[in-house]
């Protein structure tokens, strides 16, 4: 009898293995997730690459596009594992302060949070945070040919003060292009302030060479630019801040890949540092990054995450990955689930 049951069990096991997989149906809870972003996308068609809206492709399909104003994505009925939501509505070009107000008033479900907004986040408010995926750096124009002025400014910047006060300790202080979580060696790049050496370098410059203009493109970076200018003054440099393309720019580049070599290539391209050679080991990757930063053409300052404030009715796992990709397919809204 025992032998017979063993044979039957073997036959049944083989049948189960041979059966084709049946796509698992998912419940349809419905509802519209209301998202606000500050990006002002004026293109004729919705973006097809990058982070944010393009991440919805596959699970959702675009059904309405109002350039610079609004995008609506509806659940893709053909997707394997249909989203719980019926749709996602994204309001574009919303200032961070207004986003935070809309979240507090229940007019939005997911909003972006900057350092100023994080100060005012109510206790217990749910947030989603990516890994530090934004590189904030100073990049010198080609016309700034004297390496001494570049090094003097690099040594004068007090990253710790900016990080603690202006950034609310968000992200990480860094002197590297790649964040520590990705490369494992970012700590080897110095972030120390050395005012005596900075002053010594500045003292050897002509009066004209000590005058620099600092430009920025993103208004969120203005407070950091102002603090960098104050630090520069302590080193004997005169830095004026404006939104134009200055002698040095305060810029932000995004980590687009979890592969360190590809990520370094993308950041180097975004900062106009050239294309690093292909790295086939952590040691060669470190050497290439060190070569890109020699001469202080670019001075990394911080690595910052994406941070989102999330409304109370949003349920499910975090809607962003470590790289900041949107993953809304497993979210549902309270009151729409039986």
Where are these regions (language model features)?
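Structural transition elements
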Residues: 168, 172-205, 216-223
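Ligand-site clamp/hinge motif
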Residues: 77-119
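Exposed, low-complexity coil/turn segments of extracytoplasmic
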Residues: 19-63, 79, 109, 155
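Paired acidic/hydrophobic, glycine-rich loop segments that form the ligand-binding mouth/hinge
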Residues: 36, 108-115, 247-253, 300
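Short, solvent-exposed loop/beta-turn-alpha elements that line the ligand-binding surface or hinge
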Residues: 48-65, 81-86, 120-130, 139-147, ...
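Ligand/substrate-recognition segments at binding pockets and active sites
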Residues: 67, 203-257
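Alpha-helical secondary-structure segments
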Residues: 34, 87, 132-175, 209-221, ...
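Short, well-ordered beta-strand elements
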Residues: 31-38, 58-63, 70-72, 86-92, ...
């Amino acid at each position: 009898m025992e032998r017979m049951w063993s044979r039957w069990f073997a036959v049944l096991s083989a049948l189960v293995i041979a059966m084709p997989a049946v796509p698992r149906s998912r419940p349809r809870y419905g509802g519209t997730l209301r998202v606000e972003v500050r990006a002002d996308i004026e293109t004729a068609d919705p973006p097809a690459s990058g982070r944010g809206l393009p991440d919805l492709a596959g699970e959702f399909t675009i059904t309405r596009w109002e350039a610079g104003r609004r995008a609506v994505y509806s659940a893709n009925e053909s997707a394997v594992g249909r989203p719980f939501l019926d749709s996602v509505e994204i309001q574009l070009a919303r200032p961070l302060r207004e986003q935070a107000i809309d979240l507090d008033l229940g007019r939005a479900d997911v909003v972006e949070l900057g350092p100023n907004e994080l100060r005012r986040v109510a206790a217990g408010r749910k947030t989603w945070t990516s890994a530090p995926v934004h590189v904030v750096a100073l990049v010198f124009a080609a016309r700034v040919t004297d390496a001494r002025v570049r090094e003097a400014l690099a040594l004068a910047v007090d990253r710790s003060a900016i990080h603690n006060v202006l950034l609310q300790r968000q992200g990480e202080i860094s002197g590297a292009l790649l964040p520590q979580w990705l490369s494992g060696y970012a700590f080897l790049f110095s972030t120390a302030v050395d005012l005596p050496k900075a002053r010594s370098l500045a003292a050897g410059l002509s009066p004209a060479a000590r005058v620099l203009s600092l430009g920025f493109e993103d208004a969120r970076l203005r407070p950091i630019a102002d603090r960098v200018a104050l630090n520069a003054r302590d080193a004997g440099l005169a830095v004026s801040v404006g939104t134009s393309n200055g002698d040095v720019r305060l810029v932000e580049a995004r980590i687009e890949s979890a592969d360190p070599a590809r990520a370094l290539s993308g950041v180097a391209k975004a900062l106009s540092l050239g294309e690093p050679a292909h790295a086939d080991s952590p040691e060669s990757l470190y050497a290439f990054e060190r070569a890109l930063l020699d001469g202080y053409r670019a001075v990394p300052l911080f690595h910052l995450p994406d941070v989102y404030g999330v409304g109370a009715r949003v349920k499910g796992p975090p809607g962003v990955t470590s790289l900041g990709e949107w993953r809304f397919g497993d979210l549902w809204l309270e009151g729409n689930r039986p």
